[in-house]
UniProtKB/Swiss-Prot annotation:
A GO BP entry: L-arginine biosynthetic process
Catalytic activity: N-succinyl-(2S,6S)-2,6-diaminopimelate + H2O = (2S,6S)-2,6-diaminopimelate + succinate
InterPro entries, A to Z: ArgE/DapE_CS, Bact_exopeptidase_dim_dom, DapE_proteobac, Peptidase_M20, Peptidase_M20_dimer, Peptidase_M20A
Organism: Pseudomonas putida (strain ATCC 47054 / DSM 6125 / CFBP 8728 / NCIMB 11950 / KT2440)
Binding residues annotated for Zn(2+) 1, in chain numbering: H73, D107, E170
Function: Catalyzes the hydrolysis of N-succinyl-L,L-diaminopimelic acid (SDAP), forming succinate and LL-2,6-diaminopimelate (DAP), an intermediate involved in the bacterial biosynthesis of lysine and meso-diaminopimelic acid, an essential component of bacterial cell walls.
Keyword terms of this UniProt record: Amino-acid biosynthesis, Cobalt, Diaminopimelate biosynthesis, Hydrolase, Lysine biosynthesis, Metal-binding, Zinc
Family from the record: Belongs to the peptidase M20A family. DapE subfamily.
Active site: D75, E141
EC number: 3.5.1.18
Name of the protein in question: Succinyl-diaminopimelate desuccinylase
SUPFAM superfamilies: Bacterial exopeptidase dimerisation domain, Zn-dependent exopeptidases
Subunit comment: Homodimer.
Listed pathway(s): Amino-acid biosynthesis; L-lysine biosynthesis via DAP pathway; LL-2,6-diaminopimelate from (S)-tetrahydrodipicolinate (succinylase route): step 3/3
Length: 383
């Protein structure tokens, strides 16, 4: 293990944050450590505790000019079986292969450390920079996400705060640092479908209506439906059934009801209303007795090539020598809430190969490179 004195400022802070067991929605004083450092270099700090969630908003600079915000989360997912880890999950150990090991190393305490150190350096090097550097940090990203970034964004909108550009520190890289950045995400629309039949005895099917039999053709049609073609930035919209439940557990009883959980990951070529209408039409066509409860997790968003994406790509190229690939693949992130402010949003962070897994880890040296990428992006946009 590398001795603490040998660690860079970024790695020292990353290890400090990882050693705090901030399983969602607990923050475990991670934000206090970040705010202490940001406050020491002149950031204006605004803690926002909403229900059981810790958040903070911090800014440095004048009211005039563009705003570049770093966004992220201090909460992590549970470790899973601790005995399956090679090292203690919250030990923040750098192993013989130079890997920083621990829950949150990739998702996303490493990025948080890089953001803070890059911003410290930038405001000291450019104390009179144009516009503002901002931070929007939450402890409610891995959980329900009701009282975190979403709620903070609503407060910022209510007082007419402006965010021009936002870098979310989600682990976007796939094989090498900076090989992929996320310049958008698909929308996520979930539903619980209930199809009602009539319970009865399996020996007397004429006296019952089997909801499994009734639902099967409709579900098959939904699964086979071609929802859209996608576009240059998004793949076609996908429909997936994740759960089917029916039956009493007895082998001689026709069930009276079936429930199905399904999810759309949808592109900008489809709308919530359009998808809902098409589902309703298919269910009605099969003459089912049905009801559905919809849950929208987030709308699709896209940051097209422009100032932010260009600056990030140039910084990655300058630091690593590699060309980045913009992508909209993967799940949702808090970027979906920030994008509703009309903000250009890009996700850039470490390699995501072990996120949410036992033995989460990243190459420790990547964090110093990530700090430099964030710093160079600040220089390009606000110096």
């Amino acid at each position: 293990m590398t001795a603490p004195a040998e660690l860079s400022p970024t790695l020292q802070l990353a290890c400090d944050l990882i050693r705090r067991p901030s399983v969602t929605p607990v923050d475990a004083d991670c934000q206090a450590q970040m705010m202490n450092r940001l406050g020491a270099v002149g950031f204006q700090l605004e803690p926002m505790r909403i229900e059981d969630v810790d958040n903070f908003w911090a800014t440095h600079g004048s009211q005039d000019g563009p705003v570049l915000c770093f966004a992220g989360h201090t909460d992590v997912v549970p470790t899973g079986p601790v005995q399956q880890w090679q090292h203690e999950p919250f030990e923040a150990l750098i192993d013989a292969d130079g890997m920083l090991c621990g829950r949150g190393a990739a998702d996303m305490k490493g990025s948080l450390a890089s953001m803070v150190i890059a911003s410290e350096r930038f405001v000291q090097d450019y104390p009179n920079h144009r516009g503002k550097v901002a931070f929007l940090i939450t402890s409610d990203e891995e959980g329900p996400a009701h009282h975190g970034t979403k709620a903070v964004v609503e407060r910022l909108k209510a007082r007419n705060e402006r965010l021009d550009w936002c870098i979310v520190g989600e682990p976007s890289s796939t094989t090498l640092l900076g090989d992929v950045v996320k310049n958008g995400r698909r929308g996520s629309l979930g539903a619980k479908l209930t199809i009602r039949g009539k319970q009865g005895h399996v020996a007397y099917p004429h006296l019952a209506r089997n909801p499994i039999h009734l639902a099967a053709p409709a579900l098959a049609e939904l699964a086979a439906e071609h929802w859209d073609e996608g576009n240059a930035f998004f793949p076609p919209t996908s429909f997936q059934i994740s759960n089917l439940n029916s039956g009493t557990g007895a082998t001689n009883v026709v069930p009276g009801e079936l429930t199905a959980l399904f999810n759309f990951r949808f592109s900008t070529e489809s709308t919530v209303e359009g998808l809902q209408a098409r589902v309703s039409a298919i269910l009605d066509k099969h003459e089912l007795d049905w009801s559905v409860d919809w849950a929208l997790s987030g709308l699709p968003f896209l940051t097209e090539p422009g100032e932010l994406l260009d600056a990030v790509a140039a910084s990655i190229k300058g630091v690593t020598g590699r060309d980045t690939q913009p992508s909209t693949s993967g799940g949702t992130s808090d970027g979906r809430f920030i994008a509703t402010m009309g903000t250009q949003v890009v996700e850039l962070g470490p390699v995501n190969a072990t996120i949410h897994q036992v033995d989460e880890r990243i190459l420790a040296s990547d964090l110093d490179l990530l700090t430099e990428i964030y710093y160079q992006t600040l220089v390009r946009l606000l110096a």
